[in-house]
Amino acid sequence: MPAPKKISETILSAMKQMQPVIEQQKTRDISEADTVTLIKDVMSEALGYDKYLDLTGEYAIRGTYCDLAVKFDDKSKISIIIEVKAIGITLDDKHIKQAVDYAANEGVEWVILTNAVEWRLYRVVFAKPIDHNIVHRFDTLELDFKKSDSAEALYPICKHAFQKGVPEKMLDLQKATSRFMIAALLLNSDNVLTAIRRDLKRVVEVNVDEDTLADILKNEVIKRDALEGKDATDAAKLVDKRSGRKLRKVESKPAPESTPPTSQP
């Protein structure tokens, strides 16, 4: 996601200074508390947050203090919860669960998981059970901040980006280009099926009805994992809602049983 020129220049200038510090602190294997301090420096110097107005480490959720939280411009409502791990710890999916639970309890939509080297941005999914989607990730030590496009990696977690709704737009783009949405469009959009039917007639001069096309797409073309599960169901419902019709019902054909080889006499 392109960053505005002024913000891009700020990110590049700050990270040219901060990157060697991050690398040095990783070599020293600093503690989690010191990693929190380093992260606050990155967020204030490079990402546009006010260290004193926007960032707090004294926010209690059900009696437990989160590592860091973001309140934009000293507002009372938390906008982002930040889960910090010591710089020497490799980030793992299990690390995000506690932060997502914290966020869900407070109605907070965004969570950042970081060890100062790697940064991951998640969107909380308020469902039963609570879930999360990873929206963006980057490694500060793998980027070359002499190149302008490196700023684009950090921009989505900048204060300016959140205020402009950039992470939400990235999530929308992610959903729009997912295999679930593309599969749902192929199967449930009359316009798409009509276009395929029309082109088939033009190419091979044969009329094929749309239900037959949908059946072929589902059973022979589209991978099964793009058609099953909550993401697939949600995508199909969205296509159905936008097209104003009921979902197309297509029966899945069982996989053909393999025939054992005939033994030779």
Positions of predicted regions on the chain:
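Acidic beta-strand-to-loop metal/phosphate-binding motif
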Residues: 112-114
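A short, conserved, highly charged catalytic patch centered on acidic carboxylates
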Residues: 2-110, 121-265
